[in-house]
Amino acid sequence: MFWRRLRPGAQDLAPKGLPGDGDFRRSSDPRLPKLTPPALRAALGARGSGDWRIPGGGAAWWPEGDAKPGVGVGRLPPRLPALLTATRRAVRKRGLLRSLLPPPLLSAGASRESAPRQPGPGERERPRRRVAREDPDFLGAFLGELLPSRFREFLHQLQEKCAEEPEPLTSPAPQHQRGVLEHCPGSPRCPNCSFLPDLWGQSSHLQDSLTKISLQQTPILGPLKGDHSQFTTVRKANHRPHGAQVPRLKAALTHNPSGEGSRPCRQRCPFRVRFADETLQDTTLRYWERRRSVQQSVIVNQKAALPVASERVFGSVGKRLESLPKALYPGAKEETLASSSCWDCAGLSTQKTQGYLSEDTSMNSSLPFCSWKKAAAQRPRSSLRAFLDPHRNLEQESLLPNRVLQSVLKQGCPKGYHLLLASATLQPDKR
């Protein structure tokens, strides 16, 4: 093979051959010398006892004298580390949290003094990992410079809470009843209040409304099942039709002297029934809907009673007209009966009634009594039941002629009749 001649003074480089050549073996790194098993075991043991440790477990994973699992024959199986208890785990977490929290706030001069010392000209700067390990507050100080002041105050408060003694893990009362028992208004430790709604965190307006409801509903609910300490006895008397004096309702509170079964918190519950999957807002809404329906039913009953009362009033007027003396006029009673019989028919409009009233007034002023009687006999008798209203009773009184009304007033009638016919006496003055 032809080789080019090198210049004088140039560096002589060995030619690179193929991977299988011997030149490649000479150019590669020299291998480490092979160690015997006893020497290897000694080296690994020295490294395990020194800096080489398993995080979290340390050298406790393997028995003393063992370098690694699989080295040596006939060794004991590896031992697992002991499980951490709840208290050790809490202490470990607390220590980790303290290392993450920033140090307390200091002034500018103090912060400069507490800052890590700068290495001198002859000293060597330590790596950051070793600084963080030796100084646990390094990370906290670094975070304190970056975080805002409010968040630092929150972290300080959290650090103070962590510094306090830990609460006992076991408590006599279950955790789901603890929140209810702490805020129970009656007694601080009442095991019978678990069904009450937890009002902690609710708005003040809702709490005030619930207290008002409880005060209103406590005497109405009466004795609850299984509560023998406080109960209300109410005696109700039947209504007597002959006007006998009805005795008043009497309520007497009797207390049980033995004191067994005392449940002071149950009477403050505003609701008798609360479902398991129902929230406090749903219970309140259901209660108010029920109360609203009761109020609406009372209003409807009052409206339905108004026409009944008007019918009673006009029925009494008809009876008084029937009781008029026959000696006044021979046809007066017939006319009053004819006018009263028109109330039991159906279908009379407002325009027709006004026309009839105008006919009555014109006839009373111009025609004699006999012509008015004939016109009244020819008049169709239709209903005034649609106008049986307390505001229209004065218009219905004008159906009678003025002469008959004046004669009735002269003879003398009951006081109530004067009041009903007062408008009829004022009509001639207006004309």
Swiss-Prot record:
Instruction: Please report the organism this UniProt entry assigns to the protein.
Output: Homo sapiens
Transferase recorded as keyword:
no
Task: Spell out the Low complexity composition-biased ranges.
Answer: 106-121
Q: Where in the cell is it found?
A: Cytoplasm
Mark the transmembrane ranges.
Answer: none
Ranges of compositional bias, category Basic and acidic residues: 22-32, 122-132
Q: Please give the positions of the paired cysteines in each disulfide bond.
A: none
Does Lyase show up as a keyword for this record? no
Q: What keywords sit in the KW lines?
A: Cytoplasm
Q: Which InterPro entries match?
A: DUF4685 (IPR032756)
Cite the Pfam families for this sequence. Answer: DUF4685
Protein name per UniProt = Uncharacterized protein C9orf50
Mind telling me which GO cellular component terms the entry cites? cytoplasm
Renumbered residue ranges of the record's region Disordered: 1-37, 102-132
